[in-house]
Amino acid sequence: MHQVDPNLTRRKGRLAALAIAAMASASLVTVAVPATANADPEPAPPVPTTAASPPSTAAAPPAPATPVAPPPPAAANTPNAQPGDPNAAPPPADPNAPPPPVIAPNAPQPVRIDNPVGGFSFALPAGWVESDAAHLDYGSALLSKTTGDPPFPGQPPPVANDTRIVLGRLDQKLYASAEATDSKAAARLGSDMGEFYMPYPGTRINQETVSLDANGVSGSASYYEVKFSDPSKPNGQIWTGVIGSPAANAPDAGPPQRWFVVWLGTANNPVDKGAAKALAESIRPLVAPPPAPAPAPAEPAPAPAPAGEVAPTPTTPTPQRTLPA
């Protein structure tokens, strides 16, 4: 009989136990792994609102524009205030402000008259016309005051016979030209013209003296009235003005550049002192027009073209005749 090795049996039993234990462990692993693999995923924690959302492939509609609030008005007298918008609309006009003055586009302008004989020009007063000055003893311009419209087209208007204006150069025909100053010349002119145009006995009253300034040229004026001895005559009035510069002492100085205005009136048709002053101050020297420019020098005639060279013509000597002795 074969004797069984007791160690072999013990080994087989130990091996069998190990095999059974291994199989049991494998079954436990097999059951646990599928359970863990097939379980639902753990829910993700909530996403904070500040986190950026994942980009979307679809184009999202644009968000409505946020209205921009207008900037607050700058405080008055602020040293660091920003300048206003140059393109901003101007503020509305004050409804209570007075309207600007309206200037008539067709307002008549004063008529300016040249007087070549006296070498001056002046502005014609409103309501006056230029008359024929050929019969004047002194002066070179005569003005008359109109009293109405012309009776017929093309005819002169009616004029007053108790007032007139005389203008001219203060030349040697008048004693007043010898006075060195304009104030003395105006007073002397008024005295002489008063006696010439109002040769009636009376007394001078209401005498005045006025300074003149014609665009920087000084002058002076004198005014007085005459109370005639005849009570039937209205008081006479005379306004005389002298303006310009007296003659210089230089030997090569030209004629004196002084002109005068004599405005005659009466109590019935008084002198307009303001208009007389404006008339005297409107006097300007009449500047002669500049001479015509000299004609341009004629262009020199072109030089004649050089003549072609001409070959000299050979000359044949003339035979000489010998006379017998």
Swiss-Prot record:
Q: Name one GO molecular function term.
A: extracellular matrix binding
* Compartment annotation: Secreted; Cell surface
Spell out the post-translational modification annotation for this entry. Glycosylated. Runs as 45 and 47 kDa protein, the nature of the difference between the 2 forms is not known.
Q: Name one GO cellular component term.
A: extracellular region
Region Disordered: which residues?
38-110, 286-325
- What is the recorded function of this protein according to its Swiss-Prot or TrEMBL entry? Might function as an adhesin for host (human) cells. Cell surface Apa binds to human PSP-A (SFTPA1) via its glycosylated sites where it might down-regulate the immune response; PSP-A probably binds other bacterial proteins as well.
Task: Give the family this protein belongs to, as stated in its UniProt record.
Answer: Belongs to the Apa family.
> Under which name does UniProt file this protein?
Alanine and proline-rich secreted protein Apa
